[in-house]
Amino acid sequence: MSGLPPAVSGERFEFDSAAGRLSCYVAGNGPPLMLVHSVNAAASAAEVRPLHEHYCGSRMVFSIDLPGYGHSNRSDRPYTPRLMTDALHALVTKIRARCGAAPIDALAASLSCEFLARAAAEAPASFRSLSLVSPTGFRGGQSRRRAPGSTLAMPWLLRTLRGPPALQWGGAVFRGLTRPGVIRYFLGRTWGGKNIDETLWAYDIHTTRQPGAEFAPLHFLSGGLFSADIHTVYESLAMPVWMSHGVRGDFTDYRGKSLVDGRPNWRFSIFQTGALPYFEVESQFREAFDRFLLEADGAGITGSPSAA
């Protein structure tokens, strides 16, 4: 993406994978930390910027652009949980080749928590800990225990969004959803208020103007990136897991947390923020995150989960 500036600091490198050509930023020195942005119409590594910029002072931080986003391959192809999970597996391989074979700490936001959880369930030896920020799949009344690998895709909706082959109005639909004012509106729903991060808003506008920017979001909007078996995946995780979320905006229904809140390897924090608390209460979030990592490092996560 020749016209797209870097989302965060550090070196940006690209590599081929089963998920296509991927882009990732790396900065800092020390134990590796993998950061995974959320999935929406305007996603990119810019969504993890506060964490990337802070932790590169003490860790080697890897912040990926998922397939269909940022500088990664944005071709017209099916975008699925399998594709996203394969991208994370590929990045883990790169991280371990560079940093050694020790298991890594990884953090993801929103829907990408499902991809990270699946990657960890499939390759548990690769991950020391998982941090899930405002994870999807915990809405009250849901039961997502369908066949392994199944999704919530609605093919009819994808066809409607894309339009017939002769017209292909999907690009126009996407452009309507990513006008500057619309992006601001949806960020406001994420934050639960008007005091959004203006730097992120500006980058979102830029990244949605890149060629192929509509393809992954159309699959997202039609349900194709949501896993129908994610409850089974979450329950299978045996490494330390920290789940955090806010209380404002569109992402506040976590009644389904009862699925895992009795498990000794899970920890929980609630922040008086929207869905991306590390933008709003950086110090408070980092303090809770650091405490979790320290506990995970000392193998102290063995008793009943705590709340903060």
Language model: regions and residue ranges:
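Catalytic active-site module of serine/aspartate enzymes centered on a nucleophile-bearing elbow/loop
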Residues: 263-308
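Short glycine-enriched nucleophile-adjacent loop
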Residues: 113-124, 130
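Active-site loop/oxyanion-hole signature of alpha/beta-hydrolase fold enzymes
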Residues: 63-107, 111, 123
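N-terminal cap/lid segment of alpha/beta-hydrolase-fold proteins
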Residues: 2-21
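Conserved HGGG/HGGXW glycine-rich cap/lid loop of the alpha/beta-hydrolase fold
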Residues: 23-71
